[in-house]
Amino acid sequence: MMLWQATPASLWQGRDDSAEAPNALRLFQTIVRAERFAPQEMPGDIALLGFACDEGVRRNKGRTGAADGPATLRRALANMASHQGHDRCVDMGTISVDGEQLEAAHQALREAVADCQRVGKRTLVLGGGHETAFGHGAGVLDAFPGEKVGIINLDAHLDLRFADCASSGTPFRQLALECDAQQRGFHYTCIGVSRAANTQALWDEAARRQVAIVEDLEVLTAFETRVLPELERNIAQFDRLYLTIDLDVLPAREMPAVSAPAALGVPLATLLRIVEPLCRNGKLQAVDLVEFNPLFDIDGQGARAAARLAWQIAHWWR
């Protein structure tokens, strides 16, 4: 596959405690690495994919560096303990962007995701900017053409921008247009939105598209009455769920390593309360973690937070 590369073994290294007990294992010891892109030949039902791209962030006038996110997050995951669920993970490599050719990278990711999904592998994608979401989401739509797919975005931003070209600010507008083209419903929920970070034009577009929104303040002050009903609605109404997590939904004190750190944000402990029921309900088909930018990390703090989130998702995923 063009733009695809196998993950170097050097990224999956860690402390070996196996002399203590046979089950004293870490992720670097249980993950399987694909040497070529052939998901139908690989074990496990969680396909880990990287999308090494921040061209969308550059186009959106953000701080670049997220292209190095997948490699850094793999290193952070490698030394974490391997428990129930983690032995289902197979590293299916990374899609990279060639220069400024985001559209080609989107197509490659879309095809890779659809190929994994069609052979029974759910996809866990490490970005990359939030442009990741168009390629990932489109691949899920392609794999399940006759089904209702609910898109849940944990994010400070709506990412419904009007623009002349694709960027990290346009993925859900692109997915809306893709749903229009496929004559299917666009079912989008955004949780953690900062009103201060989205113009009225974006709120108007969200209203036009009937986007379900839970603001960051509502997450913090009305979790049981605003967040839980939205999660229950998505689980009840849709055949498949696609969860995309923009790490800038976290407070800057927990996640400094993003293009646009959040002054308020939703704490990691609260985010996990949202993620757990989505992982355990049996309908979650795809997850990505995006916008991690190692250039702005502080003592590996952001990498550890993002890796814990990915680790927990794989552990809970049913």
Swiss-Prot record:
EC number(s) per entry: 3.5.3.8
MF-aspect GO terms: agmatinase activity; formimidoylglutamase activity; manganese ion binding
Protein name: Formimidoylglutamase
Residues binding Mn(2+) 2: D155, H157, D246, D248
Superkingdom assignment: Bacteria
NCBIfam families with a match to the protein in the record: hutG
Keywords: Histidine metabolism, Hydrolase, Manganese, Metal-binding
InterPro entries per UniProt: HutG, Ureohydrolase, Ureohydrolase_dom_sf, Ureohydrolase_Mn_BS
Annotated binding of Mn(2+) 1, by residue: H130, D155, D159, D246
Job of this protein: Catalyzes the conversion of N-formimidoyl-L-glutamate to L-glutamate and formamide.
Co-factor binding details: Binds 2 manganese ions per subunit.
Family recorded in the similarity comment: Belongs to the arginase family.
